[in-house]
């Protein structure tokens, strides 16, 4: 059983993990048996983190209710997301709540026996501005990697890090997600990589951690935030997108000189961006999903498919650098704008899962008397069960919202017509008209016809949850091939 430990650092880390979860829900194949998500974020109330954790919990409940074996063709929810190794997903950072940075580093205590300030005090005052020192940390480092580099170094002393190290096997891999233009990601990536490669020999599993293949994606600027024009300068947000590029250049310069311990490093960013509301963090920071986050999640898929990644004594044999590009410039990306290798990974899974979610949302209530539902007793008891009414319905809504957010972002990713069109159901893929089939039925009546034709081939002794998802996968796969030319 191979595992991929995915460290998501800061808000960008959580959002890329969200996109990865959506890809796995849709059935994108990834070359590991389990994903182990680990989030490093001092923002205790981060909305993006909260939403991602809820999504992964729903995903896991669905995955555990479905059999995945050679007999069942279903690919939806096919990869296990292991939430047991790091309960709650987040690796805690101690002593960062209700405290400012100068208290955290013990600045007032940097005195000798006579009460005179020590050289450490002078050094700290030189390294950190007065605003840095007075900064609180409960919502993160607010674009200050110099603060993050001090605070984040403590996570290796946590019980969660010890549990992580002990669970790593010799066939496992590690992947790190971070942004480069803020505070948490820019400081967290180099620190985490250093601590993984130089892990103490006293920890259980240390050799497996030290020599595990490590990949990373570093996300360059892809959005802006509105300036905070509060007349009280002391109350202005510390997040200033005017500094994103200069911070990126500084970090890239550091990476070039010092970052050579990863096996594969992916770079991604965009020069077209949307301006978000300025929020330093907490429950108000809810960024819409973005194509860049989806592409960053595809870096994780790519990494698992790379063979022969070796490391000896904490040093990789060589470092590979990769970038992502679309086939042609487009402010609104459709499938036709993507390279063939990307389409081979995502087009069928995203299309079939979108069909599944739209049917459940738009049509299912009108079709519960169809043979496919009656013959397998998909009745009120089933549709009111926790599996369907909570986990699957919440996942459906989150997925469709994820697609809608990407379609409304800049640069937009809009491969599907998401609006409800019951008289034109299969005009789903933007720019690709549906094929004609030999049938007197159309739209959702044709959808039901495919469900009815496939339901007789299901094993009758399986769990209802399994039968439901398997039936829809089989019917949608055949329907997508016939109407949408999806192979």
Regions found by a protein language model. Name each.
Residues 1-25, 29-172, 180, 201-487:
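Terminal, contiguous helix-loop blocks that mediate binding/assembly
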Residues 21, 185-197:
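Short Gly/Thr/Asp-enriched flexible loops that form oxyanion-binding sites at enzyme active sites
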Residues 173-174, 195:
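Subunit-assembly interface segments of extracellular/virion macromolecular structures
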Residues 178-186:
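A phosphate-binding catalytic loop at a beta-strand-loop-alpha-helix junction
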């Amino acid at each position: 059983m191979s595992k991929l430990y995915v460290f998501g650092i800061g808000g960008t880390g959580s959002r890329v993990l969200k996109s990865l979860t959506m890809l796995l829900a849709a059935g994108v194949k990834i070359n590991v048996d389990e994903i182990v998500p680990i989030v490093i974020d001092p923002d205790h109330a981060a909305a993006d983190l909260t939403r991602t954790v809820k999504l992964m919990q729903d995903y896991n409940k669905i995955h555990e209710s479905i059999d995945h074996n050679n007999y069942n063709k279903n690919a939806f929810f096919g990869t296990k997301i292991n939430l047991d190794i790091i309960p709650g997903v987040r690796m805690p950072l101690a002593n960062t709540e209700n405290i400012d940075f100068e208290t955290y580093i013990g600045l007032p205590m940097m005195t000798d026996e006579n009460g005179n300030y020590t050289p450490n005090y002078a050094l700290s005052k030189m390294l950190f501005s007065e605003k840095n020192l007075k900064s609180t940390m409960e919502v993160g480092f607010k674009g200050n990697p110099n603060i993050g580099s001090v605070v984040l170094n403590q996570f290796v002393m946590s019980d969660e890090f010890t549990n992580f190290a002990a669970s790593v096997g010799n066939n496992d891999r590690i992947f790190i997600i971070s942004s480069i233009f803020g505070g948490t990601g820019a400081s967290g990536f180099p620190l985490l990589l250093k601590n993984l490669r130089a892990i103490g020999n006293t920890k259980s599993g240390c050799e497996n951690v030290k020599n595990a293949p490590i990949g990373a994606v570093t996300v360059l600027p892809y959005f802006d935030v509105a300036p905070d024009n509060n007349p009280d300068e002391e109350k202005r947000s510390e997040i200033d997108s005017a500094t994103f590029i200069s911070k990126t250049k500084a970090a890239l310069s550091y990476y070039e000189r010092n970052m050579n311990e990863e096996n594969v490093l992916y770079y991604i960013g965009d020069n077209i961006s949307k301006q978000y509301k300025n929020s330093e963090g907490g429950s108000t920071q809810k960024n819409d999903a973005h194509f860049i986050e989806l592409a960053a999640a595809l870096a994780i898929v790519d990494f698992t498919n790379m063979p022969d990644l070796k490391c000896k004594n904490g040093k990789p044999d060589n470092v590979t650098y990769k970038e992502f590009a679309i086939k042609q410039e487009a402010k609104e990306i459709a499938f036709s704008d993507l390279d063939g290798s990307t389409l081979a990974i995502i087009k069928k899974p995203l299309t079939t899962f979108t069909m599944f979610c739209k049917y459940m949302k738009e049509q299912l209530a009108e079709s519960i008397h169809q043979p496919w539902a009656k013959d397998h007793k998909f009745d009120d008891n089933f549709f009111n069960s926790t599996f369907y009414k909570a986990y699957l319905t919440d996942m459906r809504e989150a997925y469709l919202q994820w697609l809608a957010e990407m379609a409304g972002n800049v640069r937009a990713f809009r491969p599907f017509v998401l609006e409800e069109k019951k008289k034109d159901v299969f005009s789903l893929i933007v720019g690709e008209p549906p094929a004609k089939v030999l049938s007197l039925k159309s739209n959702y009546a044709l959808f039901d016809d495919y469900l009815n034709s496939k339901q007789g081939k299901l094993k009758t002794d399986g769990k209802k949850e399994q039968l439901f998802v398997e039936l829809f996968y089989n019917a949608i796969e055949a329907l997508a091939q016939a109407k949408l030319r999806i192979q």
